[in-house]
Amino acid sequence: MARKDNKEIFIGPDEGAHLPILDIAHKVPSESLGSAATIVEWGLPPGVMIPPHTHSREHECSYVLKGELTCDVGGEIVVAPVGSYVVKPRGVYHALCNAGTEPVWVIEMHAPGGFESWYDEYEQIASKFASGEIDEEEHRSTRAELSERYGVNFHDERIPEVMARFGIGP
């Protein structure tokens, strides 16, 4: 349901644009909150990690709806069960993982808003990578170019260390 100015005032459980490769659903776009925040929901299958990265513009807060989310926030590992919040301040690196056996589902808020556009653009890159249209090197370089525009820095060199700390991977 939208008001006359087209800003959302009610978003149902199955509403919001869904990005299938990333398994992210846009729930509250930044324009609905005067650019103050963006809210999305995302899922993470068992054994999957969101790589270490740092945001230079946004604070993030995750609320765990389902499963257990393992997080490395600035070097501190926390395991967040259902009902937990995980705060990831701007400028602090973080990585997120589903180290369990059940899917994880999270509500994520970015403040200020606008980061939903990164998800939209990265969905296209991830789709090309998943289909084999681009290789891993091009995937990383394209992701880096996109992320630079949005103030995100991925720390791929930390992936083996973080995977070991999360207890996942080879």
Predicted regions and their residues:
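A short, N-terminal "cap"/entry segment at the start of jelly-roll beta-barrel domains
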Residues: 1-37, 134-170
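Glycine- and acidic-residue-biased ligand/ion/polar-headgroup-sensing regions
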Residues: 57-69, 74
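Hydrophobic small-molecule pocket/channel-lining residues, especially in calycin-type beta-barrels
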Residues: 48, 56, 69, 117-120, ...
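A hydrophobic, small-residue-rich beta->alpha segment in the mid-to-C-terminal subdomain
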Residues: 117-133
